[in-house]
């Protein structure tokens, strides 16, 4: 039995769950999410909790049991609390600007890079520069990608990070706040 899959998912009071065959819909104060689960698992609602069970003990069913439980748990957490991925942008002149559903990133290119934000995803930028650890006394800006769908938040965060990945000599670029960087030593030169 999957250690993750056998744990029940508590349903808060403000959340409504609808199970229609293999489709699970979760509606809460922050929005609504739906997920089609694999046919090897079945979701059962008991009192104020959800149980994810597998239909048989086949290998695909065992593989997808814990995954399905985590997907449903993330939906419940997303519609109640939401998800946030904290990030930092470090570099002289590097900035972020949000206008509507577009994010303009100025990161050392000759033009700002624009990213269309999907529905339900927003970017919150802290306009106050802060010192950044491991980046040779540089200043940077903190920002966060916010949404109710954990996968979409992670996808947008990865897309933003790919615009200017970390540079290992000075520590410039876009990074996750939890990411650690080991700086490389530069050339020593002739003596």
From Swiss-Prot:
Domain of life where this protein originates: Bacteria
Keyword RNA-binding: yes
Molecular-function GO terms, alphabetical: rRNA binding; structural constituent of ribosome
GO cellular component assignments: cytosolic large ribosomal subunit
Signal peptide: none
Single Gene Ontology BP annotation: cytoplasmic translation
This protein's UniProt keywords: Ribonucleoprotein, Ribosomal protein, RNA-binding, rRNA-binding
Disulfide bonds: none
Keyword Ribosomal protein: yes
Function: This protein binds to the 23S rRNA, and is important in its secondary structure. It is located near the subunit interface in the base of the L7/L12 stalk, and near the tRNA binding site of the peptidyltransferase center.
Subunit structure: Part of the 50S ribosomal subunit.
HAMAP family per record: Ribosomal_uL6_B
Name of this chain's protein: Large ribosomal subunit protein uL6
Organism whose genome encodes this protein: Cyanothece sp. (strain PCC 7425 / ATCC 29141)
């Amino acid at each position: 039995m999957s250690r993750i899959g056998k744990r029940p998912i508590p349903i808060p009071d403000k959340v409504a769950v609808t199970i229609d065959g293999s489709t699970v819909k979760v509606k809460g104060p922050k929005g609504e999410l739906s997920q089609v689960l694999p046919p090897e698992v079945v979701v059962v609602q008991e009192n104020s909790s959800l149980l994810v069970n597998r239909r048989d003990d086949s290998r695909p069913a065992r593989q997808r049991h814990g995954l399905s439980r985590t997907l449903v748990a993330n939906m419940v957490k997303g519609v109640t609390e939401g998800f946030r991925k904290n990030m930092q942008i470090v570099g002289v002149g590097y900035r972020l600007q949000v206008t509507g559903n577009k994010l303009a990133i100025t990161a050392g290119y000759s033009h700002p890079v624009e990213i269309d934000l999907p529905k339900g995803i927003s970017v919150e930028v802290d306009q106050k520069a802060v010192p950044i650890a491991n980046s040779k006394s540089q200043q940077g800006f903190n920002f966060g990608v916010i949404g109710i769908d954990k996968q979409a938040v992670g996808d947008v965060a990865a897309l933003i990070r790919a615009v200017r990945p970390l540079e290992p000599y000075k520590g410039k670029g876009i990074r996750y706040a939890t990411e650690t960087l080991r700086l490389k030593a530069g050339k020593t030169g002739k003596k």
